[in-house]
Amino acid sequence: MGQKVNPTGFRLGIIKDWTSRWYDDGPVIAEKIKQDQVIRNYVHARLKKEKAGIAKIVIERTTKHIKINIYAARPGAIVGHKGEEINNLSQELTRITGKEVKIDVIEVIKPEIEAQLIGENIAYQLENRVSFRRAMKMAIQQAMRAGAEGVRIRCAGRLGGAEIARAEQYKEGKIPLHTLRANVDYASVTAHTIAGAIGIKVWVYKGEVLVQRLDAIEEEEMKKMQERRGDSRGRGRGDGRGAKRRRRPAKKA
């Protein structure tokens, strides 16, 4: 199961959160899902020239406005001089959606271990006729140096302009796909080359999540159990609840 399913969707609600965070019911849901995709496509196309390095876009909705959180490697390219670029983008999205749009830009601390950015970097190199093997190996080395515990990259298509399409992959470290507490970042990117489209899939293992929280919960439960045992022992010895009841003498008629 873990070998086939999307690692992000497999962990939703456990260690991963949704990128669209809002609630609605009725036929409006389909319209809003479609609008979220339109927003993401527009932001990616609009900021492609700036090379901001967008890792992900999180959309939150209220009744009056839409809040968009953009996680980027170069936030300065999105904000622009004195915030001009981000204000223009906010106004454009307001016209498209018909609601007030607020944009927050959050910096990605380690872009070398973000699966989306790794995939886009490899796609850019393939489109500029760089050897796919060199691009994949360089990306893996950079990610491992940046602190990743495991990286796997797979390219499929007419690699190197070959007549017959094939798939090749490189892996370093470990990628636990079945472990739900394993923080595995996944992305799929398409490179449009002269020979045709090449699909790029990236898995990055960043370590386990919730291990410390689970240990803390177990410790708290053990302490509570010990306290309960201590209380029950104290009651049995001291307050007479645990002692045998004495029989009262029968009344004489």
Curated annotation (Swiss-Prot):
It comes from the Bacteria. Keywords: Ribonucleoprotein, Ribosomal protein, RNA-binding, rRNA-binding. It comes from Chlorobaculum tepidum (strain ATCC 49652 / DSM 12025 / NBRC 103806 / TLS). Pfam families: KH_2 (PF07650), Ribosomal_S3_C (PF00189). Residues 221-242 have a biased composition (Basic and acidic residues). This is Small ribosomal subunit protein uS3. The gene is rpsC. One of its GO terms (cellular component) is cytosolic small ribosomal subunit. GO terms for molecular function: mRNA binding; rRNA binding; structural constituent of ribosome. Belongs to the universal ribosomal protein uS3 family.
